[in-house]
Amino acid sequence: MVTKKQSRVPGRPRRFAPEQAISAAKVLFHQKGFDAVSVAEVTDYLGINPPSLYAAFGSKAGLFSRVLNEYVGTEAIPLADILRDDRPVGECLVEVLKEAARRYSQNGGCAGCMVLEGIHSHDPQARDIAVQYYHAAETTIYDYIARRHPQRAQCVTDFMSTVMSGLSAKAREGHSIEQLCATAAMAGEAIKTILEE
């Protein structure tokens, strides 16, 4: 008995949609981190071949850059909305930390902050991309504090960065939203004391 090998029906090749690839890759990079994800894993996950990836994004780091851009645009803490000049500085900074705790807590298998985790990448290009976003957020926080507390701006910004990095790390370790919010609240009290508000 001879069995016929089923051949694929000819037709148009599957279309590659870069925007859908970015959204899908965002989950992968967020769950595992840039360094832990191989090009083969990315292409398999996206259902494309390596040449398609390179044609669309140039490299894995190029894809990561686009992913971070989308992440910052859709999932980052809305600093511009929270850091308001009509409210006490300490109160707004506490809200930033609480929002970080909420956003960094486990969400569909993606915990922590992709930017904060990205700055630890061993790949120089990926790390530089993440550092740009990190510095932009730090500068926004620093400038906000400096408008009313110029002499405390650097130390409070450093403290905020340290606490947010810790919240991200603890979220990735599996800390609950309640634990993260409690830490954010304690850190917020310290900030209010430092600013004497």
UniProtKB/Swiss-Prot annotation:
Sequence ranges assigned to domain HTH tetR-type in this UniProt record: 15-75
Lineage: Bacteria, Pseudomonadati, Pseudomonadota, Gammaproteobacteria, Enterobacterales
UniProt keyword Transmembrane helix present: no
Keyword vocabulary terms for this entry: DNA-binding, Repressor, Transcription, Transcription regulation
Taxonomic source organism: Escherichia coli (strain K12)
DNA-binding region: 38-57
UniProt-listed SUPFAM superfamilies: Homeodomain-like, Tetracyclin repressor-like, C-terminal domain
InterPro entries (UniProt xref): DNA-bd_HTH_TetR-type_CS, Homeodomain-like_sf, HTH_TetR, Tet_transcr_reg_TetR-rel_C_sf
Protein name: HTH-type transcriptional repressor BdcR
Function: Negatively regulates expression of bdcA.
GO molecular function, one term: DNA-binding transcription factor activity
Gene that produces this protein: bdcR
Entries under PANTHER family matching the protein: HTH-TYPE TRANSCRIPTIONAL REGULATOR YJDC, TRANSCRIPTIONAL REGULATORY PROTEIN
GO BP term, pick one: negative regulation of DNA-templated transcription
PROSITE patterns tied to this protein: HTH_TETR_1 (PS01081), HTH_TETR_2 (PS50977)
